[in-house]
């Protein structure tokens, strides 16, 4: 079975997650330091890493590794904050 249709779907879902996160923060409907924002970033980047690696787009893999690392770091900090 050819995996490329599933890889393509994963890539488009990753794009959608990142764009939704950016839209929500840009329209002040979500905080940039919030857990949902960081989850959208990490999930979207993970899906784009899968897609980019499959197609051999290593610069895209690199930027998305950095993106997911930043999201994971921010997520860990957000989860350590006391709840008010």
Predicted regions and their residues:
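Short, amphipathic, aromatic/basic-enriched membrane-interface segments that mark the entry/exit
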Residues: 26-37
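Short helix-adjacent coil turns
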Residues: 56-57
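Alpha-helical transmembrane segments and their membrane-interface exit regions
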Residues: 67-76
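Transmembrane alpha-helical core residues of multi-pass small-molecule transporters
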Residues: 40, 44, 66-67
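Structural signature of hydrophobic alpha-helical transmembrane segments
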Residues: 4-16, 60-68
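Short, charged juxtamembrane terminal tails flanking transmembrane helices
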Residues: 80-84
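Alpha-helical transmembrane segments of multipass membrane proteins
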Residues: 19-23, 46-53, 72
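N-terminal signal-anchor/start-transfer transmembrane helix
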Residues: 12-26
């Amino acid at each position: 079975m050819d995996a490329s249709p599933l890889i393509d779907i994963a890539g488009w879902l990753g794009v959608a997650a990142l764009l939704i996160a950016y839209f929500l923060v840009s329209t002040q409907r979500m905080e940039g330091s919030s857990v949902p924002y960081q989850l959208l970033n990490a999930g979207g980047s993970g899906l784009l890493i899968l897609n980019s690696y499959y197609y051999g787009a290593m610069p895209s893999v690199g930027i998305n590794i950095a993106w997911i690392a930043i999201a994971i770091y921010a997520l860990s900090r957000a989860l350590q904050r006391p709840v008010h």
